Amino acid sequence: MQPRRPDRFDGLEYRGTSWGRGEGDPPPYQSSFPARSFSSSGDLSQHWVTTPPDIPGSRNLHWGDKSPQYGGADSNAGPPAFGEENSNSANSGEQLNRFAGFGIGLASLFTENVLAHPCIVLRRQCQVNYHARNYQLSPFNIVNIMYNFTKTQGLRALWKGMGSTFIVQGISLGAEGILSEFTHLPRELNHKWNPKQIGGHLLLKGLVYVIVTPFYSASLIETVQSEIIHDNPGILDCLKEGMGRVLNLGVPYSKRLLPLLVLTFPTVLHGILHYIVSSTVQKCVLFFIKKKSPPRLPADGSNTVQNKLEDYFPELIANFAASLCADVLLYPLETVLHRLHIQGTRTIIDNTDLGHEVVPINTQYEGLKDCINTIKREEGGLGFYKGFGAVVVQYTLHAIVLQITKIIYSSVVQTSS
């Protein structure tokens, strides 16, 4: 039986009144509602009909059905709304994004500062050891020396001076920020650079290296001195020794100690050249990687980790190649720089030929030029590359860690998708 459809519905005869046609006053029971003006046209498309209130569960019911109540046992949970699905996928993608970024950054920080430090210790000890007959150019010799040091002095001997290297990095970053604020020299170069900006940026870097020079010298001493003779230095000894070097206070040094003015030029030269080479190589590697990689479409939340890998790993590879090229090209200058810094400090280092015993450092260089000529005359051209095998070991470990990190996160992508 079909329900009888009314012949006419004008909102409970609302339009039949004179007020509905805009001709009279509103009835008393509607005086509290705002007045609305309606045209007197009889077009049904202009009729105003109020909708019933939205009663939960009252939609799509058949004859005799009851409206289900909220929280009832018989109510079935419907599928999530479209916005809810997007928000859930966005939240999971955000978590994967943070996890990927944190993990990749932590792996890079661990590799560059912790895992590479034993190689830096061995490299510096070989560079300043002018007594050495074995130049340690092979990575296998470096591994053998590491084993001998560990057997005689323990694992601590391979990570000595690591705290002072962090202090030097902190001083460098702090000095760069303060100088940039007061001198308005650019800390970074944008894409639309000009020669004036490059000059100001390199000037800022040079001023930072001038400030860091005494603390770098103190950190170098902590890195190369033997654990057999000296006690383990404190965390702030680097700051104390650096300030003592500036103010001519603290432990008396030898007369062969070079003044800071003599050490400043090679330190600034090495720092600026290292920065220029590494920045140039990094930009070139990133350019070629992005040029060869295909354009990427916007991905869903399941591919956020893969996208993060594609964003981060080209930068890590570029940083790896930049540091490698800069260290290899400037290795001879670094050898000269370290010998100038260590001269006259009465430092006793480990014997890198045997892996045990100690040897003193008693050089008499007069400056940068004299040091270069003396090394060339007494040790030959390969004397500038003493300890180069440590560079091979360092960057081999770095490459292995990068590859392992990439494999781990690729497996995470496959399991999450």
From Swiss-Prot:
The lineage of its organism: Eukaryota, Metazoa, Chordata, Craniata, Vertebrata. InterPro entries: Mitochondrial_sb/sol_carrier, Mt_carrier_dom_sf, SLC25A46. Solcar repeats lie at residues 95-186, 310-415. It is a multi-pass membrane protein. Residues 1-13 have a biased composition (Basic and acidic residues). May play a role in mitochondrial dynamics by controlling mitochondrial membrane fission. Belongs to the mitochondrial carrier (TC 2.A.29) family. It comes from the Eukaryota. This is Solute carrier family 25 member 46-A. Keywords: Membrane, Mitochondrion, Mitochondrion outer membrane, Repeat, Transmembrane, Transmembrane helix, Transport. Residues 1-90 are annotated as: Disordered. The chain crosses the membrane at residues 102-122, 162-182, 198-218, 257-277, 313-333, 382-402. Residues 31-41 have a biased composition (Low complexity). SUPFAM superfamilies: Mitochondrial carrier. One of its GO terms (biological process) is axon development. It is found in: Mitochondrion outer membrane. GO terms for cellular component: mitochondrial outer membrane.
